[in-house]
């Protein structure tokens, strides 16, 4: 086929750049430190900073913004809440109720 033939489809492909811009590389470097750089940073921290990293008091958690609070803290449900949920969902788990009835029958025998 000839290069100027109307049947030939040509795509515009951007030139591949093997390296990213230096500004972008610097931003990535700042955002994602390597494990080695973390070790170096931790070695240079004064002991006072490490003491402040201890367990937070309840007052500190209340003063912190929602983004600063730990999201992984588990708060167990209260007994009142569990009883309320169980009352609402009595028939929501029939297999659980069947298992309870079977255990009670086995105890009677």
Curated annotation (Swiss-Prot):
Compositional bias segments (type: Polar residues): 55-75
Subcellular compartments: Cytoplasm
First-listed, main subcellular location of the protein, grouped into a coarse class: cytoplasm
A GO MF label: protein phosphatase inhibitor activity
Keyword Cell cycle: yes
Residue ranges, annotated region (Disordered): 25-109
Keywords, sorted A to Z: Cell cycle, Cell division, Cytoplasm, Protein phosphatase inhibitor
Gene Ontology BP terms: cell division; intracellular signal transduction
InterPro entries in alphabetical order: PPP1R1A/B/C
Domain of life of the organism encoding this protein: Eukaryota
Cellular component annotations (GO), alphabetically ordered: cytoplasm
Record has Hydrolase as a keyword: no
Residue spans of biased composition, Basic and acidic residues class: 45-54, 100-109
Family: Belongs to the protein phosphatase inhibitor 1 family.
Functional description taken from the UniProt entry: May increase cell susceptibility to TNF-induced apoptosis.
Descriptive protein name: Protein phosphatase 1 regulatory subunit 1C
Organism: Homo sapiens
Name of the encoding gene: PPP1R1C
């Amino acid at each position: 086929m000839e290069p100027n033939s109307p049947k030939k489809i040509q795509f515009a492909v951007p030139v591949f750049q093997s390296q990213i811009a230096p500004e972008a590389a610097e931003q990535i470097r700042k955002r994602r430190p390597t494990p080695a750089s973390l070790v170096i940073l931790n070695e240079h921290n004064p002991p006072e900073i490490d003491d402040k990293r201890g367990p937070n008091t309840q007052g500190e958690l209340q003063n912190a913004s929602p983004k600063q609070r730990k999201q992984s803290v588990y708060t167990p449900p209260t007994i009142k809440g569990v009883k309320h949920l169980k009352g609402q969902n009595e028939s929501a788990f029939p297999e659980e109720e069947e298992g309870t009835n079977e255990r009670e029958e086995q105890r009677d025998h």
